[in-house]
Amino acid sequence: DSFASWHRALPLFDALGIKATFYVNTLPFDAAFGTERDRYFDRLAHKGERQALSAEMLRDIHSDGHTIGCHSHSHFSLASLPRAQWDSEIRRSKDILEDLTGAPIVHFSFPYGMRRFFSSALRDYCRDIGFETIATGIPGMQTADTGDRFAIHRTGWLLDRPIDHNLDDLRIDGRLFERVTGRSAIG
């Protein structure tokens, strides 16, 4: 989601020898900023610091060996957009990130990530424009034999929570939760 706080976490990742994937929205890097940027943060219902990641911070994250992935341009629910707008949200974001990092961007994560926010047509589109993996927001353990690299589980990591809380979140199998309760594991 492109928050500056990601950059402040780099020393912790370095100290622990951890490499992470950061899925980035690109609206904060676009020349159009202004009120569109304010609406972006309001839409995310962000309650804390509203400082966006700068281009320099993004390059630092990338040069530290972390993976940069695409998360759309302005974090809209892509499933609610007509097909004609997918390029402006997805391909535009991919192009901006490739320009900023100087590297191919081959990983994508659907904004919001729950099943109602993406479709097989969106998944196919992302694959067709060159993404090698697609992350959902469906929590659960991801293992090499899980299978579909175009439906990877993604579990958030909350820096203000104890590590045990975050590890418990990683153990949740979102698919089992949905099957048992009939509800989404994340909202």
Region locations from a protein language model:
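Alpha-helical segments flanking ligand/cofactor-binding loops in enzyme cores
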Residues: 11, 59, 123-124
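C-terminal active-site subregion of NodB/CE4 polysaccharide deacetylases
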Residues: 3-4, 80-107, 112-187
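Metal-dependent polysaccharide deacetylase catalytic core of the NodB/CE4 family, i.e.
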Residues: 3-4, 14-116, 151-152
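Conserved beta-strand->loop/alpha-helix structural units within folded catalytic cores of enzymes
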Residues: 1, 6-9
